Swiss-Prot record:
Protein name: Small ribosomal subunit protein bS20
GO biological process, one term: translation
Region ranges (Disordered): 1-22
Gene Ontology terms: cellular component: cytosol; small ribosomal subunit
Database matches in Pfam families: Ribosomal_S20p
Role this protein plays: Binds directly to 16S ribosomal RNA.
Length: 89
């Protein structure tokens, strides 16, 4: 446990941020999983819709500073590639 007042405040702030980031990441994983479920089911239309939502959530996570921009770009690219392969087949 910290003794310095400023560090005690930082610990509280860090805990709030950790919980907020955890919620954003959890929501992100949920939407990516929904996209993958739609792809596994072979539903092109639902996959396209969930891809848009997942991309939006990834961009939102970047703007909130939860994930790095390159990580979001890499994930969006992989999801789009998966959707394109599904639509082509």
């Amino acid at each position: 446990m910290a003794n310095i007042k400023s560090q005690i405040k930082r610990n509280l702030t860090n805990e709030k941020r950790r919980l907020r980031n955890k919620a954003v990441k959890s929501e992100l994983k949920t939407h990516v999983r929904r996209f993958r479920d739609a792809v596994d089911a072979g539903d092109v239309e639902r996959a396209g819709e969930t891809l848009r939502i997942a991309s939006r959530k990834l961009d939102k996570a970047v703007s909130k500073g939860v994930i790095h921009a390159n990580q979001a770009a890499n994930k969006k690219s992989a999801l789009a590639r998966t959707h394109a392969n599904l639509a082509a087949s």
